[in-house]
Amino acid sequence: IKGAMNILMTGDEKMLNTFIQDFHMKFMKLSPEEIAFPRSCNGIEKFSDNVKSRRRTANKLEERDSKKRKTKTLLGTLDGAKMTYGLFAPGAPIHVKGAILYNHLIEKNKLGNKYPYIQEGDKIKFINMKEPNIYQASAFSFPAKFPKELNLLGCIDYDEQFHKSFIQPLQFITNKINWRIDTSYGMQGTLEDFF
């Protein structure tokens, strides 16, 4: 951002776009730790659908037992209705969804001895994920070190990360001075390339 700010003050639109193209190529080679957004993680329990679903299930079971129903409830259902729950409750912030996913995958892959679980109030980093993905998540969070054992490197949305962390802050200024940012980052073909 500092380099781009210097160009905004002393250069022109073409210089800025050349700088952005060069930086885009460097950015795409950075590690997840280097490109992730820092955040403080609050609301893991509040937005974890597993906690909410356990409470709902307990309430339903109490209600069912109090009515003393004589019919059996099928496996995977509650009072005859199928119950499907995801990892996150509706309205969860993106970085909290990422933290819930991280904790779930660390537990599922038995990596708890190598990587710490994210707790309420922890400082974390989060990255945007390509969608759709097998976890139906838009982000993945981690405490300090990205767990490469989870094989999520291919799911990282570097373009979205670049846009949100670098282009959007620049556009706040370039829009005011009527400069256009070439979002093809030098990858757009020309009519000459066609022939």
Where are these regions (language model features)?
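DNA-dependent DNA polymerase catalytic subunits
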Residues: 1-195
